[in-house]
């Protein structure tokens, strides 16, 4: 388990909102199983475990191995599946876990972004702070890599990715410099890409350069893994499979993710009574979820001091009605 360490963010808050009664709980972003273990522990302490089941989903083989070890003491109540969380409904169906009368789906947790282990492993290529291959795949079975994006996407496509997924104002400039540089030598490592970007941002302070690097690497990672499309798909799937009063708990780490979650919750919680002036007995569209967190739940200063990754975390909760 030591090869996949990840300190869970907003652990107490997320499990508090998630666990209500016995049934099935899904950790769709299993990682090192920090949240999953706490969910099972909470069910146990509330005497709900005997008729409950935890489903953990992850596409990272290292995470699956670590989680299996970590949850060994709860093996009878934990079922781990390897796959993309966007395929949540299909994974449940193919494993005979959907529409299980004994285990209605009471809660689904999504802890978005990447794990500490993935960031800290140079060979995964997620971090600009240490040199590794330009990979950034969350699953080793995926085809598209960061190297493919950086070395083969045209300038316009790179610029769009940097602007749309990184919200980077220097998107066009950086895309142009990458295309110019790769004509001489392909960019094969995170260090080479980071150095190129820093060299072309020398008018900026080191702090500003680092922020730009974070945005560019985030943008490439989102493109490689299709993260925003995956998020939209899993939100819809989660909404479909949740039982009545089941809760969807989502932790996001940047504005793009949070915007999608907030918009989805608002759409599900709204009614449509048609155009003004038209009197209807029933709405065209009824609300299917109730938002339980009017404002996102944020990490405490104490948690941020212990885990800097918690600084940007936002937790939102909605309940199916």
Swiss-Prot record:
| A GO cellular component entry from the record | cytoplasm
What keywords is this UniProt entry annotated with?
Answer: Cytoplasm, Methyltransferase, rRNA processing, S-adenosyl-L-methionine, Transferase
The similarity annotation says: Belongs to the methyltransferase superfamily. RsmH family.
What name goes with this protein?
Ribosomal RNA small subunit methyltransferase H
SUPFAM superfamilies recorded: Putative methyltransferase TM0872, insert domain, S-adenosyl-L-methionine-dependent methyltransferases
Q: Where in the cell is it found?
A: Cytoplasm
EC number(s) given by UniProt:
2.1.1.199
A molecular function (GO) held by this record is:
rRNA (cytosine-N4-)-methyltransferase activity
One Gene Ontology term from the biological process aspect of the record: rRNA base methylation
Q: Which NCBIfam families match?
A: 16S rRNA (cytosine(1402)-N(4))-methyltransferase RsmH
Protein task: Specifically methylates the N4 position of cytidine in position 1402 (C1402) of 16S rRNA.
For the keyword Nuclease, the answer is no
* PANTHER family given in the database record: 12S RRNA N4-METHYLCYTIDINE METHYLTRANSFERASE, S-ADENOSYL-METHYLTRANSFERASE MRAW
Q: Which organism is it from?
A: Chloroherpeton thalassium (strain ATCC 35110 / GB-78)
Q: Which reaction(s) does the protein catalyse, per the Swiss-Prot or TrEMBL entry?
A: cytidine(1402) in 16S rRNA + S-adenosyl-L-methionine = N(4)-methylcytidine(1402) in 16S rRNA + S-adenosyl-L-homocysteine + H(+)
